[in-house]
């Protein structure tokens, strides 16, 4: 098996052509011609993940977030990105990321959020091409809920310890917009689409001042997207059922954000 065989299969699920212009999805370290004997799937490409891959005999790491996102001027072993790059190269581990490519397919990040909330009539929030790909999604709750009810519902479905929210609506909520990861820039669009609730992450302070009849929730960047790791693994095992594909055993400790006082 070659690296290119694995990445080609992932790109059927999440095509590189749909990534955002600022993104760096794709093969980041290694060659499509490199031989691969095992794949390790994680969320962020950290030195710890590379070490885990090597210990498992994996020579390809697949993550959601790209290891190299913007241009870098130096590779420093004291920096987490630099350390991961050096460790991957020294160990002969190829590194691949499916970032906004996985955000923009309905079977990916936002679609997983919708399925977790059992939304009905789900469609792409920011449709592109023929309407089958794009950022975010929007759908209807099975049962209308007040703001406090939906807060409890989301907390339970996503297994959250905390949610940052604007003032909970007292009127029934039916239409919900979702965007995994940093979605603060799409708040106005969610409102324009008729959503009464918008669930995303990385919302800035002033965006919690919402107009009447609209509510936002910030459930955390990691928490909103982490299910994509299981989706990647399922895709690989479906296409290569006898190949060694692993999910990182450290996912429970992978979130770089730590919550205290809960």
Per-region residue spans from a language model:
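Active-site catalytic microenvironments in core metabolic enzymes, especially phosphate/sugar-handling
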Residues: 1-262
